[in-house]
UniProtKB/Swiss-Prot annotation:
Protein name (database record): Protoheme IX farnesyltransferase, mitochondrial
Location (main, coarse): mitochondrion
InterPro entries in the record: Protohaem_IX_farnesylTrfase, Protohaem_IX_farnesylTrfase_mt, UbiA_prenyltransferase, UbiA_prenylTrfase_CS, UbiA_sf
Cross-referenced PANTHER family: PROTOHEME IX FARNESYLTRANSFERASE, MITOCHONDRIAL
GO biological process terms on file: aerobic respiration; copper ion homeostasis; heme A biosynthetic process; heme biosynthetic process; heme O biosynthetic process; leukocyte differentiation; lipid metabolic process; mitochondrial fission
Amino acid sequence: MAASPHTLSSRLLTGCVGGSVWYLERRTIQDSPHKFLHLLRNVNKQWITFQHFSFLKRMYVTQLNRSHNQQVRPKPEPVASPFLEKTSSGQAKAEIYEMRPLSPPSLSLSRKPNEKELIELEPDSVIEDSIDVGKETKEEKRWKEMKLQVYDLPGILARLSKIKLTALVVSTTAAGFALAPGPFDWPCFLLTSVGTGLASCAANSINQFFEVPFDSNMNRTKNRPLVRGQISPLLAVSFATCCAVPGVAILTLGVNPLTGALGLFNIFLYTCCYTPLKRISIANTWVGAVVGAIPPVMGWTAATGSLDAGAFLLGGILYSWQFPHFNALSWGLREDYSRGGYCMMSVTHPGLCRRVALRHCLALLVLSAAAPVLDITTWTFPIMALPINAYISYLGFRFYVDADRRSSRRLFFCSLWHLPLLLLLMLTCKRPSGGGDAGPPPS
């Protein structure tokens, strides 16, 4: 069927229009900049979406031949420290720069140094010392068996028994024995001193045995023998038993039963009451003061065989002296006691700690004045003891007002020489025994 003239003319017109459109499209694409060409193409059958026009990110990504070319400047990586650079193996390298000292004639202050002189002043060498920090730390934390040498045992046992504190306990016991009325019996005095010393060693050893987990957290006690593992807990308990049994036996059989009972009661009070109470209540300070006040009473009972008013006066002096002594000491160790988990006045009640210290400093004045009233000393004693009692009271007042480390240290160091001097003055001013009203000490 032959096409009509109208159909032929329509096809011819359509072909001309299509050719014109193709020609214009071709010219437009050739005249467009090359950098916008990828926005008009269908690459890898992916049509243009609105994501390509997100100019807020300031990032232009060209996807050609299935590869991405990022035209944004990469973010700089953090610069490692030049002094310590950790490697993957846990080691560390420390660089130590050794600089040659500048010689005075090398540079003149009147002219500007040139580049060659500045180069000469640079470090001569850089020494790199590889320190195996990770390995050393691992070796330090590794468990090591500590072998006990025989010649080290006396020193370890001395630290276990707190030999300095034991010496102070024995000296106060000796002062109580010497201040008691009646003749001085040397065999009884020696037995009392030995028995009291053994009882003190036993109490201190048991105290350290119970407080190992807490002493390890304190700088003041972290080097104790049980904490460091220098001796076993079994050896510590065995040593305490070997001290407690003969000590109490000597006091009971060699001196008198009253003194032995006081020694046994003091061991119980220190180990079973004071030691656990340190982590429960601040009342441990008052209980500990009672423990420290019993030794001079034991010395008095060893000489007289009875509890008189003079024994309680000596116990009261030791009781009051311990508060300024210990409260001032604990004030500088508040962080240590907190780390160890102990409940101390200086940590939980700092105001009460200072008030109690001042209160008992003033109590020493009253107790010293009561000594001649009870016929223990002459009236010369309170007069001679007035300066040292007034001085410790002044330091107690400064500690109460200032509440700082300096005032606490001054009060603590004053208490160290105050007690020996006060007891020495009491012995010097002791009232002579009249008429033999006190018989010889019982065997």
